[in-house]
């Protein structure tokens, strides 16, 4: 990809992903970025792209919330309390300053508790953090709902919600 403007660089991001990495103490996705001189192709930088990719991915739902969420949104639900959940919540908090309740739904108690502690420290303006036991509890009465989950290749593991759970205007 060519970056014009003041950057005048070419670059690419390499994405490697394996759901079994977690068992090895590694992140599911391992990303690298290479930047090159636009004229010569000479490498200028090779670096980890995990952080920049996480914020780019989390920023996308933030852009959606900026333009589509109700301005008086108070309740946000994150289903999937991992890295993408964190960057998505960061984006939501930036564009929806009235958020005061966070609902969390996850598969493992460790990731839920880590996310809860992080959210409390990072966003003291949150008045309430609720850990939900199922998707219905997480979705009902939420103004913003974000699924940041990893699923296996089996469609039966895909998260599911019902229309009647969705708050009017959410």
Please describe what each predicted stretch is.
Residues 80-82:
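Glycine-rich Rossmann-fold phosphate-binding loop(s) that bind the pyrophosphate
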Residues 85-86:
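N-terminal Rossmann-fold NAD(P) dinucleotide-binding loop
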Residues 1-56, 60-62, 72:
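N-terminal ligand-binding/catalytic initiation module
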Residues 140-141, 152-170:
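Rossmann-fold NAD(P) dinucleotide-binding segment
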Residues 127-137:
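Short acidic-hydrophobic, aromatic-tinged amphipathic segments that line or gate anion-handling sites
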Residues 68-75, 98-99, 167-168:
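Short helix-loop-beta connector
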Residues 95-123:
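NAD(P)-binding Rossmann-fold cofactor-contacting core
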Residues 146-149:
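Short, well-ordered coil/turn residues at beta-beta hairpins
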């Amino acid at each position: 990809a060519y970056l014009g403007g003041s950057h005048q660089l070419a670059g690419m991001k390499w994405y490697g992903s394996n759901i079994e990495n977690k068992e090895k103490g590694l992140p599911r996705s391992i990303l690298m970025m290479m930047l090159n001189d636009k004229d010569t192709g000479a490498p200028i930088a090779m670096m980890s792209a995990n952080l920049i990719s996480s914020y780019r991915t989390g920023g996308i739902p933030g852009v959606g919330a900026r333009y589509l969420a109700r301005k008086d949104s108070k309740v946000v639900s994150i289903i999937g309390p991992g890295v993408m959940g964190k960057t998505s919540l960061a984006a939501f908090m930036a564009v929806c300053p009235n958020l005061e309740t966070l609902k969390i739904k996850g598969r493992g108690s460790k990731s839920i508790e880590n996310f809860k502690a992080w959210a409390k420290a990072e966003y003291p303006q949150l008045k309430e953090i609720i850990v939900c036991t199922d998707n219905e509890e997480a979705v009902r009465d939420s103004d913003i709902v974000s699924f940041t989950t990893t699923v296996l290749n089996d469609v039966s593991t895909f998260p599911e919600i019902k229309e009647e759970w969705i708050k009017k205007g959410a």
